[in-house]
């Protein structure tokens, strides 16, 4: 369940957030400024404030399942993704895109063949950050999935602890579970460490 939720969220969020950030960074209009402000403002709203209304809505539309969890993660993650990608795209020279247009590329070709390769470090950075958030999150899966058969890894570890009772702790089961939980994050970080560091430090020093 954890892999399904994380992969679905990362694919959808990366596509929509990168496309939206590209439009915000390149289209100098009042509407784009307002849209950018709304994304930034959404980051300031604590989850606890909107927690109960969201769960109530999901229950009414019968989405207290993995699909509803993916939708919520995508909605919560897109604000930070747009914010980070907008700043990164602004550091990319616009002349590269204009040269592609002169060579006959349309707007979709410019986005997929020019922008996506250029912003790959930031895309990988956001995937790792959001992946860590989803992998370690407990509250949202607990509220959405509850006691359903499809549980995330954090919920499984929690229920392993609860099966031992109030004063029991099955350490022989908990320790291997926690180790298995952190190994994928370590492997992913080691594989994409170069891109992650490049994405985090982007824009820190002016050239």
Language model features with spans:
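A structural signal for multi-pass alpha-helical bundles of membrane permease subunits
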Residues: 1, 5-8, 12-207
């Amino acid at each position: 369940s954890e892999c399904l939720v994380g992969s679905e969220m990362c694919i959808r969020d990366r596509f929509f957030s990168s496309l939206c950030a590209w439009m915000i960074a390149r289209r100098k209009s009042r509407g784009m400024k307002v849209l950018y402000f709304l994304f930034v403002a959404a980051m300031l709203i604590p989850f606890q404030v909107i927690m109960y209304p969201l769960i109530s809505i999901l229950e009414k539309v019968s989405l207290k399942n993995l699909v509803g969890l993916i939708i919520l993660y995508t909605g919560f993650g897109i604000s930070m993704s747009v914010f980070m990608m907008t700043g990164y795209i602004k550091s990319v020279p616009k002349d590269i895109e204009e040269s592609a247009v002169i060579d006959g590329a349309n707007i979709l070709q410019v986005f997929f063949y020019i922008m996506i390769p250029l912003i790959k470090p930031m895309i990988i950075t956001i995937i790792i950050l959001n992946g860590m958030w989803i992998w370690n999150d407990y509250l949202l899966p607990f509220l959405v999935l509850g006691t359903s058969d499809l549980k995330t890894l954090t919920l499984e570890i929690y229920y392993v602890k609860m099966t031992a009772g109030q004063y029991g702790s099955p350490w022989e089961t908990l320790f291997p579970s926690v180790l298995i939980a952190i190994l994928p994050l370590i492997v992913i970080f080691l594989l994409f460490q170069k891109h992650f560091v490049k994405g985090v430090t982007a824009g820190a020093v002016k050239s």
